[in-house]
Amino acid sequence: MAWAALLGLLAALLLLLLLSRRRTRRPGEPPLDLGSIPWLGYALDFGKDAASFLTRMKEKHGDIFTILVGGRYVTVLLDPHSYDAVVWEPRTRLDFHAYAIFLMERIFDVQLPHYSPSDEKARMKLTLLHRELQALTEAMYTNLHAVLLGDATEAGSGWHEMGLLDFSYSFLLRAGYLTLYGIEALPRTHESQAQDRVHSADVFHTFRQLDRLLPKLARGSLSVGDKDHMCSVKSRLWKLLSPARLARRAHRSKWLESYLLHLEEMGVSEEMQARALVLQLWATQGNMGPAAFWLLLFLLKNPEALAAVRGELESILWQAEQPVSQTTTLPQKVLDSTPVLDSVLSESLRLTAAPFITREVVVDLAMPMADGREFNLRRGDRLLLFPFLSPQRDPEIYTDPEVFKYNRFLNPDGSEKKDFYKDGKRLKNYNMPWGAGHNHCLGRSYAVNSIKQFVFLVLVHLDLELINADVEIPEFDLSRYGFGLMQPEHDVPVRYRIRP
C-alpha cells in the first residue's frame, strides 16, 4: 500500500511538473493548441488520420497554428500562397536535412559519414536529366515491355486475375529496378529475360513486405512479431541489392554508377552501401506503382475519361511511322504530346498525393505570410506544410475537390490549364505531388515518363477490366499520410489478357 501511495504521489508530481512547464503562446506567434494529454498532445489524433485532424484544426485556428505532437511543437502552415516563403528559405534558417537523416536512419538503418542531402541531390541531378533521362526512358520502356508482356505471355492465353495495386506496383517497380540496377545479360535472350522476370519479382515481393510495415516502422509502433519480420525482410533486401551482386549485372544505369562512386568516395562499407541502395529503391520506385494504380482505377471507373485517353493514344499510333508491335520506345516528343493523359495524371495525383513537407526551425525567425501577416517561429520547432489539404483538396481552388475530373487541368482549346486562384489571387503552387523548393523531386520527369509508358503499354496491348464494375473507389490506408502517394485500404480485383 505504501509503495502504491508513493508511486501515486510521484505520478502526481510528474504531472504537475509537466503542466507547470507547458508552453504558452507569446505575442506574434501562431495560435497554440497543446491538446489535453501532457507531452503526447495530439499525437494519437495526428497518427490516426492526419488529414481529418488537420482539417479540424484549420477550422478552429485558421491556416497557421502550432500543435504539440509527442513532445514536439509543430507549426502547421496551410496557406499555399505562403508556401514559397518556406520552401526556398535557406538551410541556415529552415533546415530540411535533419528530418530526412532521421528517417533514413530510423527506417532504413543507413548511417553515412558527413552526409549532405543537398550534395547528393546535386550529384544525382546530372544522372536524371537530359541525355541520361532519354537513356532511362528508353530502358524503362524495354523493361516494362519485357516484364508486363513477358509475364502475360508466359501465363498463357485467356484472362488472368489479380489486384490492381499489385498489378501496377509490381510491373512498375520490377521494370524500374531493372532499369536502374541492371539486367541479367547483354545481349538479351529469352533465357536472360526470363531470369530478369523471376529475379525482379523476388525483389518486388520482398520490398512489398517492407513497404507494408513502413508507416509503423517510422512511428516506432511495430509489434514484436513485426520487428522480427522486418529484420528478416531487410536482411533479404540487403543481400539482393548488395554491391557484389549488382557488380555482375549488365546495362547498369549511370545513376547507379554515380551513386555507388559517391558512397565509395565517402568511405562507406559494402554492407552500408547495400542498405543505402534499399533506401534508394524505395525513394525512386515507391510511389510510381501506387500512382499508376489510382490513375488506372479512375480511368476504369470513368468511361468518358478512358475513351478520351484511348483516343489520344490511337491518334499517336496513327501518326507513328511504324506499327505498335515494332515500337521499341516512346520518343520524348511523343511523351510530351499527351495533354489528356497529362491532365488525368495531374488530377489523379491531386487526389492521392499526400506528402508532408517539413522544415526544422534552426533560429528564432519571423515568417512573412502572403497576406501581409507575420508570425514568429521558435528555434527547435518543426514547420509542416500539407499540400494535400490546400491547395489540392481546397474547395476555394477546385470545384468539387473530392471528385475526379479528367479534364480539370485542360483549357477549352486542349492546352494545359495553369491558372487557379485562391482569395482572388493566382496560385503559383496549385498542385504539389512532387514537393517544392529545395527538396523538389529530382526524378519527376523519369517518374512521369515511366507512368505514361506503363499506361500506354497497358491500354494498347492488354484488355483490362474491373471484375466488379460497380466496385467503389477504396478508402485510403490512413497510416500512409506523409509518405507520398496514398495507398488503398484494400486492393481492387481486376482481370487482364493480351489483346487478340
Swiss-Prot record:
InterPro entries: Cyt_P450 (IPR001128), Cyt_P450_CYP7A1-type (IPR024204), Cyt_P450_E_grp-IV (IPR002403), Cyt_P450_sf (IPR036396), PTGIS (IPR027286). It catalyses: prostaglandin H2 = prostaglandin I2; a hydroperoxyeicosatetraenoate = an oxoeicosatetraenoate + H2O; (15S)-hydroperoxy-(5Z,8Z,11Z,13E)-eicosatetraenoate = 15-oxo-(5Z,8Z,11Z,13E)-eicosatetraenoate + H2O; (15S)-hydroperoxy-(5Z,8Z,11Z,13E)-eicosatetraenoate + AH2 = (15S)-hydroxy-(5Z,8Z,11Z,13E)-eicosatetraenoate + A + H2O. Changing residue 38 to L: In allele CYP8A1*2. It comes from Homo sapiens. It is found in: Endoplasmic reticulum membrane. The keyword Metal-binding applies. Keywords: Endoplasmic reticulum, Fatty acid biosynthesis, Fatty acid metabolism, Heme, Iron, Isomerase, Lipid biosynthesis, Lipid metabolism, Lyase, Membrane, Metal-binding, Prostaglandin biosynthesis, Prostaglandin metabolism, Transmembrane, Transmembrane helix. The lineage of its organism: Eukaryota, Metazoa, Chordata, Craniata, Vertebrata. Widely expressed; particularly abundant in ovary, heart, skeletal muscle, lung and prostate. The gene is PTGIS. Belongs to the cytochrome P450 family. Catalyzes the biosynthesis and metabolism of eicosanoids. Catalyzes the isomerization of prostaglandin H2 to prostacyclin (= prostaglandin I2), a potent mediator of vasodilation and inhibitor of platelet aggregation. Additionally, displays dehydratase activity, toward hydroperoxyeicosatetraenoates (HPETEs), especially toward (15S)-hydroperoxy-(5Z,8Z,11Z,13E)-eicosatetraenoate (15(S)-HPETE). It comes from the Eukaryota. Gene3D superfamilies: Cytochrome P450. It is a single-pass membrane protein. The keyword Transmembrane helix applies. Changing residue 441 to H: Abolishes prostaglandin-I synthase activity. Its EC number is 5.3.99.4, 4.2.1.152. One of its GO terms (cellular component) is endoplasmic reticulum membrane. It is linked to Essential hypertension: A condition in which blood pressure is consistently higher than normal with no identifiable cause. Substrate binds at residues 106, 112, 287, 358-359, 382. SUPFAM superfamilies: Cytochrome P450. Its cofactor is heme. This is Prostacyclin synthase. Changing residue 379 to S: In allele CYP8A1*4.
